[in-house]
Amino acid sequence: MALLQIAEPGQSAAPHQHRLAVGIDLGTTNSLVAAVRSGVTATLPDENGQHSLPSIVRYTQDGIEVGQVAALSSAQDPKNTIVSVKRFMGRSLTDIQSGEQAFPYQFEASENGLPLFVTPQGQVNPVQVSAEILRPLVERAEKTLGGELQGVVITVPAYFDDAQRQGTKDAASLLGVKVLRLLNEPTAAAIAYGLDSKQEGVIAIYDLGGGTFDISILRLNRGVFEVLATGGDSALGGDDFDHLLQAHMQQVWQLTNLDPQLSRQLLIEARRVKEALTDASDVEASLTLADGTVLKQVVTKAEFDNLISALVKKTIASCRRTLRDAGVTADEVLETVMVGGSTRVPLVREQVEAFFGKAPLTSIDPDRVVAIGAAIQADILVGNKPESELLLLDVIPLSLGIETMGGLVEKVVSRNTTIPVARAQEFTTFKDGQTAMAFHVVQGERELVDDCRSLARFTLKGIPPLAAGAAHIRVTFQVDADGLLSVTAMEKSTGVQSSIQVKPSFGLSDTEIATMLKDSMKHAKEDISRRMLAEQQVEAARVLESLNAALAKDGDLLTSDERQQIDAVMAQLAEIARGDDADAIKQAIEVLDEHTQDFAAKRMDNSIRVAFKGQSIDNI
């Protein structure tokens, strides 16, 4: 029996209008949409009862197919069926083509070097393909919820850089959908479990999806979600398990020179076998060739475990490094949350349990937990839970800084700093009369610019022509909740400023972040030595330039012998500064300082005489 809601005319029966917002897990393999309805958070099914939408888009002469329809045709038309498009987001065509994996697609490069898929519908980029995946999810949500969405929260891997995050936002913008927040996938899982289980303490989020692996160490305390550290691999996931099994099956069947269609069929069968091995000790695989021949083989769990063992060990090694970054041990981790369909693989669960010493949490479907967390966050951000005390603190994966003289990096925002964040630091001019300053924004953990990743360059003009070191330029780094960076430089006395929003033309390569972190640890001692040398060389150059200016102005205060002695010591410093002995340079600077103290005193006396010339003692 239907219940009637009674209210005064013109008034709502509810205390406030419920705003429609959803969380979307835009995954590499599958995507989902979830919402909070009547206090219950759940993923939304399509008209066929399917919750997950395969992240597959097929372009034909007649139109565009998305999801399961596209998946069914992928084996017959691999060239025009784009799968795992998330792996192409924010990457250059050169980066993609230089990778180990071959793709069946026809590519062309855009003006800025980004990949374009050549399809029967024309050229499309990864952002447009992603928008096609988002479209049915948004339509499903609006149909189910009965109205237009006022915002969405979309999840991204923690390792996505600025370009990849911006590309995700742009995909939603193509549909006219407002993005309330981009949310790291592991953090979304923490929200789902944090609100359900009221956990307090250190939690590990082990997220192994189709294309990426993320490990996040979080501290949950009284509604505050703080990410202590993140790690992982942006090019390791269940897809790699599939490709290894595909290669194994191909070798057993002694198949060579596969055409794209047969290769796709074999990959689909490998994925089916992988999923079946979750609950079975062995599975029969089969493949039908073009001539009707049916090939069969039995794949055992032991064989599959042996194939993927090295990759699973890589994820455990990432866990170990990230725990070290967070400053905690495995024993301090209260719970481990499993996220992503690939965590259903028995070997993965076994290895994770062995490393952390406890069975991982799987009470929420690992395929749906990210979407559920995103939906909870969307419900809060859209204003449906004004009483909520949930506070979310993400972190940036790599330090951000500015290039200084000598090719050194001055870190402004350190790695694993919680975001959103704003940090400011003051810099000054190097030369007398300097009226402009070039800024080079870099990303990385190394001490020298050459070993870090360049993000952007911009110039501040209109600096007052003062003596070296007299101007004060305040540089502010702001990282918003989506991980996008804005840098502003302002000269304090005039207020003149310049700024830039960092949107790199393409993202990091698959393993670059992990490599950068490993290199920073491997070369730490060497980098410190190189930094100390560069700092002394910069100081030597500054001292010599300053002294040359002083000699040009007041050199007549010196006797011929005094001038020759200073010139000789200066030449000695210049020669030593070209070497690689930081201590020797420092010592040479000190020697020059000793030899110029009398000159400095004479300059001071002369300045005082000039200042007081013609004045009586009564006027002083």
Swiss-Prot record:
PROSITE patterns: HSP70_1, HSP70_2. One of its GO terms (molecular function) is ATP binding. The keyword Chaperone applies. Keywords: ATP-binding, Chaperone, Nucleotide-binding. The keyword Repeat does not apply. Pfam families: HSP70. GO terms for biological process: iron-sulfur cluster assembly. InterPro entries: ATPase_NBD, Heat_shock_70_CS, HSP70_C_sf, HSP70_peptide-bd_sf, Hsp_70_fam, ISC_FeS_clus_asmbl_HscA. Belongs to the heat shock protein 70 family. HAMAP family: HscA. Chaperone involved in the maturation of iron-sulfur cluster-containing proteins. Has a low intrinsic ATPase activity which is markedly stimulated by HscB. This is Chaperone protein HscA homolog.
